[in-house]
Amino acid sequence: MSSPGRPKGEYRSAQHAGAVAGPPGRPDGEHRGSSGADPNGRLRQACDSLGLRVEAAQADKLLAYLAQMQRWNRTYNLTAIRDPEQMLVQHLFDSLSVVDPLSRVVGADTAATVYDIGSGGGLPGVVLAIMRPTWQIGCVDAVEKKMAFVRQMSGVLALPNLRALHARVEELPPAGCDVVISRAFASLNDFASLAGRHVRNDGTLVAMKGKVPEDEIQTLHQQGEWQVQEIQALQVPALDAQRCLIWMRRSQGTL
């Protein structure tokens, strides 16, 4: 598996203008664009801007997933975001923004194993399963109703590569994943402490964040086992807010 290209123990900080404050660990930004525009057209434009090739069947599944989330959300409170326009941008486009970066590390057509920790309603795990059908995706969450939704999506959307794991991440047996990712789970140190055991020796932890969490990085490095390898700025289509990926690898000499 290739790496983002930074030596262990070092990281590259990406400065990015336009931050909008939001909840700790996953700031919500302001979206731009017309809510009246055709969702299919907007989805294809977003994929184009992200350098993603999306087949018609994949676009249909992405929009069906979003529609099902809106439907389930009325009863099961899968997400605090309820406005369809905000869900399109802050959930779907945000999750799509990590597909290409992950593909560059593990390969787009490999049989990579990826865990999505604290997945909630399947973000970004369901999106990854749709866009990369050869990847084996495990969505992990301690809330049963959210995993019931992901399990339903695996069947409704015909995603045999998607599994829903209703459990606390620390209680699952080690999975030997190529990548373990989280979108709104915990601080970097807590994420590494709880989920790092599921990453194979040369694998990668990836945290989706808003602005660069400098304090969290310092705390992580003080613990010594995991180091930030790279900070990659993301530009989410139609979203005026900072987004970044924090890539982490085990420090030299730790297993």
From Swiss-Prot:
Places the protein is found: Cytoplasm
Function summary: Specifically methylates the N7 position of guanine in position 527 of 16S rRNA.
Keyword Membrane: no
GO molecular function, one term: rRNA (guanine-N7-)-methyltransferase activity
UniProt entry keywords in alphabetical sequence: Cytoplasm, Methyltransferase, rRNA processing, S-adenosyl-L-methionine, Transferase
Region (Disordered): 1-44
Family label: Belongs to the methyltransferase superfamily. RNA methyltransferase RsmG family.
Name listed for the protein in its UniProt record: Ribosomal RNA small subunit methyltransferase G
InterPro entries: rRNA_ssu_MeTfrase_G (IPR003682), SAM-dependent_MTases_sf (IPR029063)
Gene Ontology cellular-component annotations: cytosol
Enzyme class, broadest EC rank: transferase
Gene that specifies this protein: rsmG
Reactions this protein catalyses: guanosine(527) in 16S rRNA + S-adenosyl-L-methionine = N(7)-methylguanosine(527) in 16S rRNA + S-adenosyl-L-homocysteine
